[in-house]
Amino acid sequence: MASVFTDFKEGQQNGSGPRLAAALTPIATSQSPDRLLSFYNFSDSDHISADLRYSLFQANGVKLPKQEQNGWVDIFAAYWKAVGEIVKFEEYNPSASWAKVFDAWKNVANTLIRGYTNFGLQAWTVPCLYVVGKYLRVFAIKADTEISSKGAMAFGDQLQDDVAADFEKSAKLEEAARIINRMFTLCLSDRAPIEESRKWGIYNTTNLLFKTYFKLNSVGLSKNLLRALSASSADLPELEAFPKSHIVTFKYYVGVIHFLDENYREAEEHLAYAWNMCHKGAFKNRELILTYLVPCHLVTTHTLPSQKLLAPFPRLEKLFRPLCDCIRKGDLVGFDTAMFAGEEEFVKRRIYLPLERGRDIALRNLFRKVFIAGGFEESKDGQPPIRRTRVPVAEFAAALRIGTHADDRSRVDIDEVECLLSNLIYKGLMKGYIARERGMVVLSKGGTAFPGTGV
């Protein structure tokens, strides 16, 4: 109990939003494992408002305007009721329910929002929105899981309405998204001078909505947030003025949104920004960024990640290394095998399609070997030798047979080979043209036949 009121007192006296928000954290700490239980037991439903007013203000010596005091009393009264539902899990109470926890915490969120709109809570307290919004999402997911599992037990052998079932599966999280959206609007629409504005909370609430929309598989709704931010950009501080943690998360999600729209260059720009700013010790965050940055780089620059880059991330090393090795060697069968082996994870992460484009690079590397194996033309008049730039299509066809592990009975169609060559030329992976009447590929001279590879 003491820790809740101590956090509130020190937060108010020092003007520390994070310390104040700690008072509303709905979990016990290692320093105070009985924090929630003792807070709930300190009063009852008949006296909670009076007890809170005394403990928050009179006993603590915290002086605030009457209206603001009323707002905090209402918020902590709602918090007390939510804690009552949470501690049932600590006590192994059979009536414990995450759905009830969510409903009670939803009241905390709505009361906190009213505190800003009706009771004049100051802008420096917006970290309270971060904490309450974060756990609103957490409790919503737990509640939906609980409801879904109970529904499966109750209706295991009965017919169900699939459309309704899909909707109800995330009903609590949908509700949480609507409330967090109100927090977003609360921050974005504040007209106070920027020094004392809730606008400083805009990227944290945006990031929370991104996470929620992605969990709901409603990525399209995230674009509405970006449009709203763009429309209000003139009234917002520069992005660099916000905390790094807010910026990195925001840039990551914006990058992924562009990635899913197949705008890989824009995606790479945002993801690279997030990668460069991300704390070196934030292992999980850096791994998430690389999950999308590697495929982006593959598409935009046709280059592969180094072993040094992936070494600290064993999961990504296991995921990408087989593909990278096959691309580098021009092993088309090995590439197809690696894509099939990682298909489930690639589809889950939504990176399958850009990785599939790596087959073109593998084919480019296979055909590049043909070009290199062709050697040099005879030098004339003491000039340095230049590589043979006229290569028979039949040589590329032979390489394709090797790259696809074709047996002696398999036939490689020349028209198919010409089509593959044309595709590589069109995509800028080769420079030259096909002289069909002579069955020849004429490649550029001067080390530009295969751009970016040095030959």
Swiss-Prot record:
It comes from Aspergillus fumigatus (strain ATCC MYA-4609 / CBS 101355 / FGSC A1100 / Af293). Disulfide bonds: none annotated. The lineage of its organism: Eukaryota, Fungi, Dikarya, Ascomycota, Pezizomycotina. Keywords: Cytoplasm, Nucleus, Signalosome. It is found in: Cytoplasm; Nucleus. Residues 248-448 form the PCI domain. The keyword DNA-binding does not apply. It comes from the Eukaryota. GO terms for molecular function: double-stranded DNA binding; RNA binding. Belongs to the CSN12 family. SMART domains: PAM. One of its GO terms (cellular component) is cytoplasm. Signal peptide: none annotated. This is Protein CSN12 homolog.
